[in-house]
Every structure is written in C-alpha cells, then in structure tokens.
C-alpha cells in the first residue's frame, strides 16, 4: 500500500513538472505570436522592446493569471457544491460579474475609474455565487442545481442585452464585444488587477486539506471537524473575487473552469494537493494556447477568445454531461 502511494505521488509530481515546463513553453509562444512573429533572439531589438515588452507581455501575464483563476474557480466550485458540472461560466457567476460591470458603467455614466469597475464586477460575481450557495444548501439534485445556475446565467445575460440595446453610450455598446471575451485591450494600466489575483491564487493552492474534506461531502467534512460555514463563505468570497477580476480583465470566458479539473482528474490528479496547482498550470496553458489561436487564426483581425474556448470546450462538456448521466 505504501509503495503504491509513493508511486502515485511520484506520478503526480511528474505531471506537475511536465505542466510547469509546458506552461513556460506556451508563455514563450505567446510572446512570439502575433500578426508579426518575433523570435526570442529579437526580443531585445528596438522593435522587440515595443511589441514584446510593452504590448505582448502584459497581455500574456493577464492570460496566464486569468486561465489559472478560472480553472481554480472551477475546481473550488465543484468541491463546494459537490457537483462535477459546477463552473463559473455555466452557473452564471461570470454573467453576474458582467451585470455588475455594466451596471457600474450605466449608473456612473462612464465616469467611474477602472478600480471601481473592477470592484463592481467582483460584487456581481459574489452575489450570484451566494445565491447558488443558498440553492446548494437546500440539497437540490445535481441536475436541479445546474438548471438553477443556467437560469441565473440567462437572467444576467438578458439584463446585459437589454442594457446594451437601449443604451446610447458607446462604452456600453463596446462592452457587448468585450463580454465575448478578449485580451486585446490589456496593457500595463491593468497591472493592479493582475496583482489582485496573485495572493488569492496562491492562497487557494494552499488549501488542499480543506478542499479534500469538502470533496468527501458535507457529512464527512463535518465529522472530520471542518467548520463548514467558515470555509463555504471564505471560498465563496475567494471564487467571486477571482471570477470578478477575471471578467474585469477579459470579459466572460467559459469552459476553462469545467474542462480543466475534469481532464486532470482523468489523468489521476484527484488529490487536491496536486489538483489545485495542476489546475492553475493547466488553465494557464489552455488559455494561453486559445489566445494564440485567437490572434493568428485570422489575418488583420482577432477572434474573441470566448469563442475559441467555447468551440473547443462545448464538445467536451457534452461528453462529460452524457458520462455523468450514464
């Protein structure tokens, strides 16, 4: 038994090492990719200093952090709601952040500073997450909780559409494209949002013991002495913060939080000591690759990254849904 445990631990460490190496490679690829490819040898040329360090580097860092945040949010929500299909985009949390952001733009007449818009997006994500947690406490079945989340997402989406349709503000109409997901407008001025993600990401990755207990179910976690009320509320705040900041940076990006934790579990990373850092690395890799595709797929144009992740993630979600019903 001890030998098997050691073998599994070594296998998990190898997985994390491979994911770390792959993330570094995709980071380099992201800095090179664009309408004009710039190889590492040219990064310190006058042209490279402008395109790589001033334009592509802040975008790449934002993609990396948002991918890690969304994947971790999915893993946390799946343990928190005891629901393998829980995911920020699917359960309406991302749309809730969008409603908060659009409400801030609408009520503030476009005069609010960037930090206030970010806080409103975080507040919107927190409100939807708290509503979902309220539903979860009523011991709804997996399918009913999923439907409740989808319904909340539809309501939030309808609110955003109505606000944008009747608005004469260019800022609100511009948000319609932005809510499809994209990092085109990210620069060093949004560095404070990136910094705001880092401590929460690191803190979540260190909470493997509590996450393992939550994954066992409410009854087992309580018997093991876990203060459920405290951890539920803390994790709700952490998840809402990560999703809200991610939406403020890049708009609504779906399926990363659903697909990444499932793929890693299928690869054997079931212990949250390995699953959480693995989700952060794999989420960063997946979104970096999607961002590269979004940049280079069309000539002189850029695809919304939400379209790329939805196109790749929707078939995987259907497969997971059919598998969970089997």
Curated annotation (Swiss-Prot):
Chief location bin: membrane
UniProt keyword list: Cell inner membrane, Cell membrane, Membrane, Transmembrane, Transmembrane helix, Transport
Transmembrane regions listed in the UniProt entry: 15-35, 61-81, 88-108, 112-132, 146-166, 184-204, 240-260, 274-294, 302-322
Gene Ontology BP term (one): cobalamin transport
Subcellular compartments: Cell inner membrane
Gene Ontology MF, one: vitamin transmembrane transporter activity
Record bears the keyword ATP-binding: no
Membrane topology: Multi-pass membrane protein
InterPro entries named in the record: ABC_BtuC-like (IPR037294), ABC_transptr_BtuC (IPR023691), ABC_transptr_permease_BtuC (IPR000522)
GO cellular component: plasma membrane
Pfam families registered for this protein in UniProt: FecCD
HAMAP family xrefs: BtuC
Family from the record: Belongs to the binding-protein-dependent transport system permease family. FecCD subfamily.
Subunit structure: The complex is composed of two ATP-binding proteins (BtuD), two transmembrane proteins (BtuC) and a solute-binding protein (BtuF).
Function comment: Part of the ABC transporter complex BtuCDF involved in vitamin B12 import. Involved in the translocation of the substrate across the membrane.
This protein's name: Vitamin B12 import system permease protein BtuC
